[in-house]
UniProtKB/Swiss-Prot annotation:
Residues 1-22 form the signal peptide. This is Potassium channel toxin alpha-KTx 16.6. The lineage of its organism: Eukaryota, Metazoa, Ecdysozoa, Arthropoda, Chelicerata. Inhibits potassium channel. Keywords: Disulfide bond, Ion channel impairing toxin, Neurotoxin, Potassium channel impairing toxin, Secreted, Signal, Toxin. The record marks 58 as: Aromatic residue of the functional dyad. It comes from Buthus israelis (Israeli scorpion). The keyword DNA damage does not apply. Disulfide bonds join 29-50, 35-55, 39-57.
């Protein structure tokens, strides 16, 4: 049981770190595919989505 709680805490810490790496860029969008190329130019990765009409890069 002790190991399970340690693993759970480690998972939460890693999740917080991964989620905090996502960043908004100043590009308006209506669909996620509109964010792929701008995010590739900014971060080097095409992992992106359109959120509240603004691109979020991962």
């Amino acid at each position: 049981m002790k190991i399970l709680s340690v693993l759970l805490i480690a998972l939460i810490i890693c999740s917080i770190n991964i989620c905090s790496e996502a960043g908004l860029i100043d590009v308006r969008c209506y669909a996620s595919r509109e964010c792929w190329e701008p995010c590739r130019r900014v971060t080097g990765s095409a992992q992106a989505k359109c959120q509240n009409n603004q691109c979020r890069c991962y």
